[in-house]
């Protein structure tokens, strides 16, 4: 409980392996919308469209790539 990131690897530059907390200044440690410990800017495509669904895009507020609300 209380983990902010996966503390499996001490080599992760975003996560303190001893505390499982994000390092100072880091917003995220992993995810499709995380790049070099920072959230990717809003609107960047993180998952290409399939069929008639539009592309999924980063929100700028999270490391996760949200499912587009048009997905079935």
Curated annotation (Swiss-Prot):
It is found in: Secreted. Pfam families: Disintegrin. PROSITE patterns: DISINTEGRIN_1, DISINTEGRIN_2. Expressed by the venom gland. GO terms for cellular component: extracellular region; plasma membrane. Residues 1-72 form the Disintegrin domain. SUPFAM superfamilies: Blood coagulation inhibitor (disintegrin). Its main location: secreted. A motif (Cell attachment site) lies at residues 50-52. Disulfide bonds join 5-20, 7-15, 14-37, 28-34, 33-58, 46-65. The keyword Cytoplasm does not apply. One of its GO terms (molecular function) is toxin activity. The keyword Transit peptide does not apply. Keywords: Cell adhesion impairing toxin, Disulfide bond, Hemostasis impairing toxin, Platelet aggregation inhibiting toxin, Secreted, Toxin. It comes from the Eukaryota. InterPro entries: Disintegrin_CS (IPR018358), Disintegrin_dom (IPR001762), Disintegrin_dom_sf (IPR036436). The disintegrin belongs to the medium disintegrin subfamily. Belongs to the venom metalloproteinase (M12B) family. P-II subfamily. P-IIa sub-subfamily. Monomer (disintegrin). Inhibits fibrinogen interaction with platelets. Acts by binding to alpha-IIb/beta-3 (ITGA2B/ITGB3) on the platelet surface and inhibits aggregation induced by ADP, thrombin, platelet-activating factor and collagen. This is Disintegrin basilicin. It comes from Crotalus basiliscus.
